[in-house]
A protein has these predicted regions:
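Cytosolic, long alpha-helical scaffolding segments
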Residues: 1-237
Length: 237
C-alpha cells in the first residue's frame, strides 16, 4: 500500500513538472513574439500574443488545482511539501510573466507606427535577451533542483536593472527634446518596465528553488539596481 502511495505521489510530481515546463515554454514564446511585434509594429502578431495568454492562464489554474489536491490527498511533509509549494509559486510567477508579455502586445496595438527610436529598441532587445536567458536558466535550475544555477540567475538581475535604468533616462531625454515623442516614449517606458519585471519574476523562481532545496528562505537581500520611478501599470483599452 505504501509503495502504491509513493508511486502515485511521484506521478503527481511528474505531472506538475511537465505542466511547469510547458508553461515556461509558452511564456518564453510570448516574450519573443511580443518583442517581434514591438519591433515591427505588427498588430496581428500582437493579437496572437494576447490570445496565447489564455493557455498560460489555464495551465496555472490546472497546476494550482493539482498541487492543492495532492497536498490534501497525500498530506506530504518536509521536502515533498516544499516541492508542491514550489510548483504553486513557480506557476504564479510564470503566469505573471505571460501577463507582462500580453501588456506589451496591447501597447503595440495602439502605438504610432511612423515613429521609431532605433537606439532605444536595441536596448529593449538587449534587455529582453537577458531576461529570456534568465528564464531559460532558472527553469532548467528548477527541473534539476540546481541551487547554484538558481543563484546565478538571482545575481544576474542587477544587469537587467542597469539596462532598464539606462533606457529610462534615455527615454526621458527624448521626451524633453521633442514633445512629439512623448506618446511613443511613454509606451516604450512601460514596455521596458514590463520586461524588467519579468526578470524580477525569474528571480522569484530562483528564490523558490533555494527554498525547495534548502528548506528555508534565502536570507540575503535581493540585488536590485532599479532606480526608475515608473510603476508597472498594465495597458488597458
Amino acid at each position: 500500500m505504501m509503495e502504491h502511495t509513493l508511486k502515485a505521489f511521484d506521478a503527481d510530481l511528474q505531472e506538475l513538472a511537465r505542466m511547469i515546463a510547458e508553461m515556461g515554454g509558452l511564456a518564453e514564446r510570448q516574450i519573443g513574439d511580443a518583442l517581434d511585434a514591438l519591433n515591427r509594429r505588427d498588430t496581428a502578431l500582437a493579437r496572437d500574443v494576447i490570445a496565447a495568454d489564455a493557455r498560460v492562464d489555464s495551465l496555472q489554474r490546472q497546476i494550482e488545482e493539482k498541487a492543492i489536491l495532492t497536498i490534501a490527498r497525500r498530506q506530504p511533509m518536509a521536502v515533498d511539501l516544499r516541492d508542491l509549494v514550489g510548483a504553486l509559486r513557480v506557476s504564479n510567477d510564470l503566469e505573471r510573466i505571460g501577463d507582462l508579455a500580453k501588456n506589451i502586445a496591447k501597447r503595440v496595438e495602439v502605438m504610432d507606427s511612423e515613429l521609431s527610436l532605433q537606439k532605444v529598441m536595441r536596448g529593449i532587445e538587449h534587455m529582453t535577451e537577458l531576461v529570456l536567458t534568465q528564464i531559460k536558466e532558472v527553469l532548467d535550475a528548477y527541473a534539476r533542483r540546481d541551487v547554484a544555477k538558481a543563484m546565478q540567475v538571482w545575481r544576474a538581475d542587477e544587469e537587467v536593472d542597469a539596462v532598464n535604468n539606462s533606457l529610462f533616462r534615455e527615454l526621458l531625454t527624448y521626451m524633453m527634446e521633442d514633445p512629439r515623442n512623448i506618446s511613443l516614449c511613454t509606451h516604450l517606458l512601460f514596455c521596458a518596465k514590463n520586461i524588467e519585471r519579468m526578470g524580477d519574476h525569474a528571480t522569484n523562481i530562483a528564490e523558490t528553488i533555494y527554498y525547495m532545496v534548502e528548506g528555508y528562505i534565502l536570507p540575503d537581500d535581493r540585488p536590485k539596481g532599479d532606480h526608475t520611478s515608473t510603476t508597472n501599470i498594465p495597458y488597458r483599452n
